[in-house]
């Protein structure tokens, strides 16, 4: 595909009315034997609220290009404009091959970072490390330009290459980056 535009969207964690998360938490409390990881988190010292927060963030947002070896996306051209990302852990976006222009976007993961730090201070880094903190990622020779964006709360705001993925090209202009309220 080419000339794909995703604009004026909000990408938010959980459900707005929290019905899904309340149902999930109630099911775990009522049937703890069916949820060993939940029990493990409690045994490690996490509170129900911390577990709720642990599950709250959106893990992955945009992936463009399905794998490092499938080059079918090499001609993709995408524009992400005027979008709002709240408490996403990764892929705002992640691009393999192709070209992306990201502008006038707000990527705010500070609340999620605060949750991660709270969990780390309570039960250690083994659990908090599962809350990743990545922003935009360019891989496999992709080209990405970010302009006039606001990025907050991400340890790795801009990434070229990710894991075993080859590097791509990524550049940001007029983009503000804050971590814990500091530029």
Write out the residue ranges for each language-model feature:
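Glycine- and acidic/polar-rich repeat regions and solenoidal domains
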Residues: 1-182
């Amino acid at each position: 595909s080419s000339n794909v535009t995703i604009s004026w969207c909000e990408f938010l964690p959980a459900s707005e009315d929290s019905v899904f998360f309340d149902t999930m938490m109630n099911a775990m409390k009522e049937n703890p034997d069916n949820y060993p990881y939940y029990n493990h988190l409690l045994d490690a010292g996490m509170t129900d609220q911390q577990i709720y927060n642990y599950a709250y963030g959106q893990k992955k947002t945009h992936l463009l290009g399905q794998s490092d070896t499938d080059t079918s996306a090499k001609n993709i051209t995408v524009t992400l404009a005027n979008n709002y990302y709240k408490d996403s852990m990764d892929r705002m976006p992640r691009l393999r091959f192709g070209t992306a222009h990201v502008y006038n976007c707000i990527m705010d993961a500070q609340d999620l970072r605060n949750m991660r730090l709270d969990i780390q201070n309570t039960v250690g880094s083994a659990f908090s490390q599962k809350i990743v903190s990545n922003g935009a990622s360019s891989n496999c020779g992709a080209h990405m330009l970010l302009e006039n964006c606001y990025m907050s709360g991400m340890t790795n705001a801009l990434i070229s290459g990710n894991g075993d993925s080859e590097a791509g090209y990524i550049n940001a202009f007029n983009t503000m980056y804050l971590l814990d309220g500091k530029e």
